[in-house]
């Protein structure tokens, strides 16, 4: 499954210039995190092991210095037959010098004991690397430097099962 951004008109520029959105193709699998791609194409949701990309964020209409940068830290903690993944996504919007953080939790329940050993798990239905989102799946960052545009980072993730 892939998604392509294309050239868009940028009506927000007073001079009526063209907003050139770089073409970015995302080939998705259930085991790969899609990068932020410079804030251009963002994943909107994650279901059944596939990225569902249904929108293209035109951040190039704002000054480059005000585009948020996504820093990702993912940690997985394993319990018998359960993997809990905690993701902290930080979006920094410069020159606003404002940092927005929101933790997101993903739980994978597709594990069952293997050979009666509770500390070893195998996937149910052949899916071992998918963490389904629980609760919110997006982080909204809005600069505090007078720019009214809202940057929305849809921060959903897959994680590797470590149990």
UniProtKB/Swiss-Prot annotation:
Start and stop residues of the Sequence repeats: 111-120, 121-130, 131-140, 141-150
Keywords: Keratin, Repeat
Protein's name in the database: Keratin-associated protein 11-1
Alphabetical list of InterPro entries matching this protein: Keratin_matx, KRTAP_PMG
Biological function: In the hair cortex, hair keratin intermediate filaments are embedded in an interfilamentous matrix, consisting of hair keratin-associated proteins (KRTAP), which are essential for the formation of a rigid and resistant hair shaft through their extensive disulfide bond cross-linking with abundant cysteine residues of hair keratins. The matrix proteins include the high-sulfur and high-glycine-tyrosine keratins.
Family: Belongs to the PMG family.
Pfam assignment, any one: PMG
Region (4 X 10 AA approximate repeats): 111-150
GO molecular function annotations of the record: structural molecule activity
Biological source species: Homo sapiens (Human)
Tissue-wise expression: Expressed in the upper matrix and in the entire hair cortex.
GO cellular component, as recorded: cytosol; keratin filament
